[in-house]
């Protein structure tokens, strides 16, 4: 293992030298003297340099390709962090393709038989040894069940975990060194990015997780005209093997075939937007890897086209609070109410509570106002979110991983929609859906349903209120970097406090009604408690 690690280190060093990636660090201005002096200890920097026409982004992309699939997938993750990376580097990393040669089919068969505890011939009436597709984590084979259903069998590459662990160790080492060496690097949070990647890559190794995600999405869109998700055959799913229904559709980028079957392209593009907002706001569970390779179009009703989604390994979800603030931010942005946008960021806890609203508002206006020079139909929701994240980072916003997944997915959906139908007006398509969601969220039925669920938490009210008051009495807990989970806890405590006030007010009101009139002065405390409780619940 140590020998492999040393060999890998030399491989990384050769790639760094070949593409002069050290320039990305050492050619930065205002380097600490001790770091700048390290250049003298690198012999290759003394040698004459061959002129190159490659940009820094292209050199980084080629280096990641040379380092193999784990680094390629890391580069793909980086390409989604446009709130962090310079545009030239992000654009180049978007070109990375997760395509690797297939592994030996005999190994795939052996792994399937080991996982299922049966011979392939006992489970499938036909199994194609030539894979349909091959990527860095798994490859896919076509097969037919004994009962006649056509399926695909996804198999994790054997021996992948040690390789991933080794490459992740080097990525963490590089990230930590970059954070120590450069203020610009610290602003990009490289260790945090590698940590997010570690979670993502290990999640992708567990095919039971992908099967569960697919089942949830299928249930969410059952009998829907918008999207179809293939059936999972749970009896044949294991941590390293996934068996799903085989679908036959047109790749969403195959414009010629879609045109030949007279697909309604405008409706298809609009339904893509509706699929996104349905997942985010109705279900709070969204497919977060909706690039064109994972999306097909059904051939059944071209006049009423339906999407088919595959590869559900990466999903995202939003809290009710994030859903609410996201919708309000979009409405405020399109009204050019930048003060409202700034205040919403502060209220949501996305930026520290001590942020100066006027300064934040001015920064948002400076970044976002040029966007409105374009026609409304050309404005990108994904770009709006990216610009807001970039601005908010200057005010110490910690962008939650789920919001990054959301922004990445939105960019994919937008790009796809405008490729299908260039005149797609995203805001006109999304606005009615958002308005309907906001109306439903604040309808009397929803408010009282929310109240009922929170009244059930009344037994915990005393303890949570005491904890909240203790935290508020300790100044050091007002740190701008207060973890999100503590902010969420505070919100829940305030909701429960509101529920308690409502309950107490109802008791007082009932007593006042028996002894006097609800309009009498004796009933005023009850009305005050009811009003305060309702305010706390709705406000939170």
Swiss-Prot record:
Chief site of localization: membrane
Pfam families with a match to the protein in the record: ABC1 (PF03109)
Record membrane topology: Multi-pass membrane protein
GO CC aspect terms: plasma membrane
TM helices/strands, residue ranges: 24-44, 496-516, 518-538
Keyword check for DNA repair: no
EC number: 2.7.-.-
Keywords, comma-separated and alphabetical: ATP-binding, Cell inner membrane, Cell membrane, Kinase, Membrane, Nucleotide-binding, Transferase, Transmembrane, Transmembrane helix, Ubiquinone biosynthesis
PANTHER family cross-referenced by the UniProt entry: CHAPERONE-ACTIVITY OF BC1 COMPLEX CABC1 -RELATED, PROTEIN ACTIVITY OF BC1 COMPLEX KINASE 7, CHLOROPLASTIC
Name of this protein: Probable protein kinase UbiB
Gene assigned in the entry: ubiB
